[in-house]
A protein has these predicted regions:
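Conserved phosphotransfer cores of two-component systems
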Residues: 43-45, 67-74, 95
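Two-component/phosphorelay signaling modules centered on CheY-like receiver
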Residues: 12-30
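Active-site residues of response regulator receiver
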Residues: 53, 81
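Acidic catalytic/metal-coordinating carboxylates
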Residues: 34-37, 60-63
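Acidic di-acidic motifs
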Residues: 9-10, 34
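As written
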Residues: 61, 93-98
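The feature encodes the CheY-like receiver
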Residues: 57, 85
C-alpha cells in the first residue's frame, strides 16, 4: 500500500529526519511547522496518516489531533514526543490518536506505521469482499 503521510513538528531538523526515515518506505505528502498550518494542510492534502509533535508554539499536538479527528475520524494519528508517552496515552486516545511514540525510540515509529498500514489493508480487503487473506467475507459472513 502506498501510504501518504503528513509530518508536523516545529523543528525543521526533526521534520527532515522523520521525513527521511518514513519517506524511505512511504510517501511524505507534506509537512507543517505549527498546528494552524497542520490543520489547513490536512484539509488540502488529505493524507492517509498524520504524525504530530506534541510541543508546538501555537497549538499543542493533542489539540491539533482533536481538530483533525473532527474533520476526518478515519485518519490515523500518531503523537511523536520528547515527553514521557505513558502520561499522554489517555488524553491522546481521547483526542483520536492511535499511537503515542517517544522520539527517543524512532524504531517504534516505523513499527506503528507498519501496524497502521496492515490495519488499513485489512479494512480495504474486507470492504471489497477480498477473503483471500482473512478467511471471512464481510458480505455474507461465510468462511472460506
Amino acid at each position: 500500500m502506498s501510504l501518504r503521510i503528513m509530518v508536523v513538528d516545529d523543528s525543521q531538523a526533526t521534520r527532515r529526519v522523520v521525513s527521511a526515515l518514513v519517506g524511505s518506505r512511504w510517501t511524505v505528502c507534506g509537512s507543517a511547522e505549527n498546528g494552524k498550518t497542520a490543520v489547513k494542510k490536512f484539509m488540502e492534502l488529505r493524507p492517509d496518516l498524520v504524525l504530530l509533535d506534541l510541543g508546538m508554539p501555537d497549538i499543542d499536538g493533542i489539540e491539533v489531533g482533536r481538530q483533525i479527528h473532527a474533520i476526518d475520524a478515519s485518519t490515523p494519528l500518531i503523537l511523536f514526543t520528547l515527553s514521557d508517552p505513558w502520561g499522554l496515552e489517555a488524553p491522546a486516545r481521547k483526542a483520536g490518536f492511535t499511537h503515542v511514540i517517544s522520539k527517543s525510540e524512532p524504531w517504534k515509529l516505523l513499527d506503528s506505521i507498519k501496524e497502521i498500514v496492515e490495519g488499513l489493508e485489512r479494512g480495504h480487503d474486507e470492504a471489497s469482499g477480498d477473503t483471500s487473506k482473512h478467511g471471512r467475507s464481510r458480505r455474507d459472513g461465510s468462511v472460506n
